[in-house]
């Protein structure tokens, strides 16, 4: 580490961070990646990129974004979270998404984002289920964010290519310390 070439990553001057961001984006078939020190920061940035104040996220009631991130989307960004039931494997069914969607109406928050997670509670959600719920979200003009803290665990369990799972979402948070053993860090990958 003492001999590593470093720079100010805020100004894009750290070649190691730049390479990491580009490598992860390429691996997932996405255009860009941004390094964050934590998953909460990465997920919050994604949520704020997809939603405006007064809009809403549809999210599994047991997902990290709803349960463990200190209501950051609501507190810092003015974005509502609409928690929905998940299946036994942690997935959200397409019919659950359709039932939760709110149209533009001045009386309530409009649904703008479906937040998914894979793995959930150590269970990898099948690629087919991820694709089906993503298709439903896209048909209903929802953006999709995947909290992939254990993304590579899911890819390994599903025996799929990283790009296949990443294609189920518009943005993906990938934790580098869970499953890969880095000291810290997350990368937000966006199309």
PLM features: what roles do these ranges have?
Residues 1-39, 61-62, 66-67, 72:
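Conserved N-terminal alpha-helix of the aminotransferase class I/II PLP-enzyme fold
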